[in-house]
């Protein structure tokens, strides 16, 4: 029902999958499907919220869901995923008005390209944390990483990014 699109539904699905595959591994990949209710306006609202979050507007409360896998993922899943190497350094915490502010720097390398981030997590009223992440340069990363919290060790991890049923996952 979109007059601007001329491809068949099958071609549109193939194009959507190709676009998703090209973005796999990006640190801020968000897949925004069609909502069950609310129509196009609801989709635009979700897009705007995602863009504001990426631009640094803090989310009310950080919510992450993690699961422990009982066995390694199937090889075919890893073969179609985008591997991302992460190096993360926790910095000395700072005292904020509502408690300690957790800080870290992180590098993400995908296909030979590295991007750097500085993240703060502040206590939120009623529990939870408000996270703010900003992109930084390599030199800033190096300088901040030198302020590592001596009670922590740097973390190296490999994530495998993929889209399943319209949702982005990092394994």
Language model region names:
Residues 26-46:
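Phosphate-binding beta-loop-alpha motif at adenosine-nucleotide cofactor sites
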Residues 4, 24-28, 125, 143:
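Generic alpha-helix detector with strongest preference for long hydrophobic helices that associate
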Residues 1-24, 34, 38:
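A glycine- and Lys/Arg-enriched "phosphate-lid" helix/loop adjacent to the NTP-binding pocket
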Residues 16-28, 95-101:
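Short C-terminal domain-edge/linker segments immediately following a structured domain
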Residues 49-171:
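Phosphate-end processing signature that detects enzymes handling 5′-triphosphorylated RNA
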